[in-house]
Structure formats: C-alpha cells, structure tokens
Amino acid sequence: MALFRKKDKYIRITPNNSLKGSVSHNVPEVPDELFAKCPACKHMIYKKDLGLAKICPTCSYNFRISAQERLTLTVDEGSFQELFISIETKDPLRFPGYQEKLQKAKETTGLHEAVLTGKAMVKGQQIALAIMDSHFIMASMGTVVGEKITRLFELAIEENLPVVIFTASGGARMQEGIMSLMQMAKVSAAVKRHSNAGLFYLTILTDPTTGGVTASFAMEGDIILAEPQSLVGFAGRRVIETTVRENLPDDFQKAEFLQDHGFVDAIVKRTELRDKIAHLVAFHGGGQ
C-alpha cells in the first residue's frame, strides 16, 4: 500500500571546496567614505549631499569640520597667512603615551597643534584669526595652544587688528597638568590688553566648546556667536546632575539654551557666518 511505501532519500551533494569564498569575491563593496550617518537624525547621507559646509540635508545638523575646511568657508581665497608654526609642543610631565598621541594627531589632521593661527581677509576686512580643530586631541588646550592664541592677540594689538576665534575644545589638556590650566589666565590677560587697546574681539562657539576654553577666552568676546545646536559648557552634564541632584533640561548646554539665558548674542547658520563676520568687523572699525 502507498501508505507504507518507503520514502525516497534526498540526493546528497558534496560541496566543492574550491568554490568556497568565490561568491564573496564577486560581491561589490561600498567604500566607507561614500556615506556618513547624521548624529542627530540618524539618516545615512551620501557625503556629496552634505556640501562644502557639511550640513545634514534632512535635519540641518552641522557636522564637525576641520580647521582647513572652516578656513575655506570663511576667508578670502589665498589671503590666509599662517603664523607661529615653529612653536612645538613639549612633554613637561613625561606623560605616558603623550608623544605618540601627538604624533598620531599631527599625521591625521595635518596640523602642528589643535589651533590654526594667522592673518586673513574676510570680504576685504583684515583680521587676526584662530581656528580650533576638535580632530586634534579634541582641541584640548595645552601650552602651545595657549601660547599661539596669546601671541595672536599681541600681534593684533601691534597691527591694530580685530581678532576672530572659532572655538572648539574638550577642555584643558590633562597630559600637561597645571601648565595647561595656566593658559586660561594667560590668554585672558592678552584678551584684556587687546580690549584696552579699543580693538574688537569676536568669538564663534562651535561644537563642542567645553572646559577651560569656555571658562576663559571663548566667553570673553565683545560679541559671541554660535553655530546651531553646538554643545557649550564647562563641566559635563552628568557631573552637574550628580552635584546639584536635579535633572537638567534636554537642551541644557546647547547654544540655543545659552542664547535664551543671555550668554550668546546670536545663533548663526554656518553658511551665513562669513557675511556676518565681515559685517561685524566693518561695523566695529574694520580691519583695513
């Protein structure tokens, strides 16, 4: 009877070992550098769609950009003259791994230190300019960063120039200990001398501006601008919540929150910063 008929066995096929891995070689790979994930809206974005300003087309999030990219966006073409290149970072505490970390940062960013300093023209207005780069050890402020910015203010006093600084930092550089913390007072003293000379100082807070930089020259500008949604603060959110034992607002330490509470004069879109800088410099006496 069919009910008790023995079922036929399946045919067994032995895989050919020579074919193993051949399929994977034929699958096209998508290069990692083609796309970027927006930290805000989580969308995957074709990098060319970000444009030169690197702004998310979906939610307008401002990606972090390098000092060189910001220079291209801000100053007149061919006008930038870099200064204080020869100042070298030392290792006063002989901190383990510090020299290796510095070398890697130099190779990755193409910078000598976490800040780019020099003179430039912005729509015909000459300025003394500093741009901090968070890709270089999170733009932490060590002795060289402090020295370069101090010298920039001293040069600006001698040449009667306004100073414009794009800030970005994770704070003082722990590998240099108290020498790093001293830069806060040193740069602030230079800012004061520049102010006493009747010269204009403009700061633009970018993401992130925290720690000792926030507690010193970042918040000492005659006018303080900020890019949208930039993180700006001193201590970290969790540290503050633990200390005060309260839950902080969701937008706490965002540029918009600081503007609402009088710490920032205006939030300016990245694509509009060049025009805004030129206007403010011209309005406050210019840098001809």
Swiss-Prot record:
Its cofactor is Zn(2+). Its EC number is 2.1.3.15. SUPFAM superfamilies: ClpP/crotonase. It comes from Streptococcus pyogenes serotype M3 (strain ATCC BAA-595 / MGAS315). A zinc finger (C4-type) spans 38-59. It catalyses: N(6)-carboxybiotinyl-L-lysyl-[protein] + acetyl-CoA = N(6)-biotinyl-L-lysyl-[protein] + malonyl-CoA. It is found in: Cytoplasm. Binds 1 zinc ion per subunit. The lineage of its organism: Bacteria, Bacillati, Bacillota, Bacilli, Lactobacillales. GO terms for biological process: fatty acid biosynthetic process; malonyl-CoA biosynthetic process. It comes from the Bacteria. This is Acetyl-coenzyme A carboxylase carboxyl transferase subunit beta. Keywords: ATP-binding, Cytoplasm, Fatty acid biosynthesis, Fatty acid metabolism, Lipid biosynthesis, Lipid metabolism, Metal-binding, Nucleotide-binding, Transferase, Zinc, Zinc-finger. It is an enzyme of class 2 (transferase). Belongs to the AccD/PCCB family. One of its GO terms (molecular function) is ATP binding. Component of the acetyl coenzyme A carboxylase (ACC) complex. Biotin carboxylase (BC) catalyzes the carboxylation of biotin on its carrier protein (BCCP) and then the CO(2) group is transferred by the transcarboxylase to acetyl-CoA to form malonyl-CoA. Residues 34-288 form the CoA carboxyltransferase N-terminal domain. Acetyl-CoA carboxylase is a heterohexamer composed of biotin carboxyl carrier protein (AccB), biotin carboxylase (AccC) and two subunits each of ACCase subunit alpha (AccA) and ACCase subunit beta (AccD). GO terms for cellular component: acetyl-CoA carboxylase complex. Disulfide bonds: none annotated. InterPro entries: AcCoA_carboxyl_beta, Acetyl_CoA_COase_Trfase_b_su, ClpP/crotonase-like_dom_sf, COA_CT_N. Zn(2+) binds at C38, C41, C56, C59. Pathway: Lipid metabolism; malonyl-CoA biosynthesis; malonyl-CoA from acetyl-CoA: step 1/1.
